[in-house]
């Protein structure tokens, strides 16, 4: 019986952001993800990890198709890891959305060796929506771009935290 190529990989580690950062090389792009029930917002950092920019919003289909697109984006951009927004409740507990995100991370980890960092995304979508409303973006347009912008928000927050820990100015 022939096994698929991805069955030969060691699963990627899934770690809190700071621990994941210790597994990433010093330079290289990171892929930021905002996981929704219908879409996945995708952002990417520059190789020096200073700035997050939007890439696209993936309309979710089946996990394998979604994962294939994410892995293709990671390969195209020579990414060294993923930052996945973890929707933690305001009281610090993890509800069904966080459990679903962790399950997605476990499944993705089985297909890649790129370390996956989890970053608290509390209120990211709300903050982005307020910003888009402030920019007078129509409701229809907000619906199209909110997940990608949330991914930017999540990844930029993670990059800023890593920058602070490194002592960069």
Where are these regions (language model features)?
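Phosphate- and other anionic-substrate recognition elements at nucleic-acid/protein interfaces
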Residues: 5-33, 38, 43-169
